[in-house]
Amino acid sequence: MSVSMRLSRGGSKKRPYYKIVVSNSRAPRDGKYLEQVGTYNPLLAKDDENRVRLIEDRVRYWIGVGAQPTDRVARMLDKAGIKERAATNNPQKAEPGKKAKERAEERAEKAREAAEAAAAAAAAPAEEAAAEAPAEAAAEEQTEA
């Protein structure tokens, strides 16, 4: 029999209250359990001491026997200093998907083309101004003479 330590929901609609229980992993979430080892009230403030209450010696016993805490319960146990939770590392989670990468490449390509066009436009008037300047200077010399 695989034993898990998990949350069993109680309370009324929109007012959750959880028991931290040890139960057969195949039993329903709110069904029969072997032992209640704590409570969790998410409606209380995060710094409230009654938000998570654990019976530490029973929790340690069940972990020693082989009960597997769920992720949420493991976080609570880690915060209480009962069982250290291994940090998870998923660097691919932050990586954008294929379509997002394609859109980013298209945007970068459009920006490059716009920069090239702006550089070409800036270079063209400078050449025209250089070409027109001697003609204007010659015209000014003729009017002065």
Curated annotation (Swiss-Prot):
Low complexity bias locations: 116-137
GO cellular component: cytoplasm; small ribosomal subunit
GO-annotated molecular function: structural constituent of ribosome
SUPFAM superfamilies listed in its UniProt record: Ribosomal protein S16
Record region (Disordered): 82-145
Domain of life: Bacteria
Record key words, sorted: Ribonucleoprotein, Ribosomal protein
InterPro entries: Ribosomal_bS16, Ribosomal_bS16_dom_sf
Annotated GO biological process: translation
Extent of Basic and acidic residues compositional bias: 95-115
Xref: HAMAP family: Ribosomal_bS16
Family: Belongs to the bacterial ribosomal protein bS16 family.
Name this polypeptide is given: Small ribosomal subunit protein bS16
